[in-house]
């Protein structure tokens, strides 16, 4: 049911953007044209960065208060849903808004989608952010999830930087995707023969 609702909101957002004549803007295009998307706002980024640690702890199975989430980690698909749902819940808990606090328009949390005509720009930004977050949840889950028996500590260490780097590709904190691990050191030379 949740997937159907999210899909419906995405189609509505796309239709609203098409009617308004607004094209999708990639983060690189936005920076080149001085257009700042809602999900690139420093205030909002602070919440995403803060929530990433909670989300990765929950979805990697390390959260003792949420043992039911550990069972969802059996596939990249389940892990991506866990990442998206946990991030959305954390942002809503922190009342993170999608608009700049300097803006006089109504502010909305992640969990509420405005319905009136005056709030169409906020609806468009909400749909854009949810799309980015959904895509990044899927990409991070695919990248970090190697097999059902992956160590939870390694999973948490991979999820947080990959999720942050995907949502904010302009902030080059870590290379995306992370480079492969360095090769193991060569074995020590054999001891000299005894004469």
Curated annotation (Swiss-Prot):
Alphabetical UniProt keywords: Membrane, Nodulation, Signal
Signal peptide start-end: 1-17
InterPro entries tied to this protein: Nodulin
Pfam family, one: Nodulin
Gene Ontology cellular-component terms listed: peribacteroid fluid; peribacteroid membrane
Gene Ontology BP annotations: nodulation
Transcription regulation keyword on record: no
Subcellular location: Symbiosome, Peribacteroid membrane; Symbiosome, Peribacteroid space
Family note: Belongs to the nodulin 20 family.
Protein name per Swiss-Prot or TrEMBL: Nodulin-20a
Source organism (scientific name): Glycine max (Soybean)
Gene responsible for this protein: NOD20A
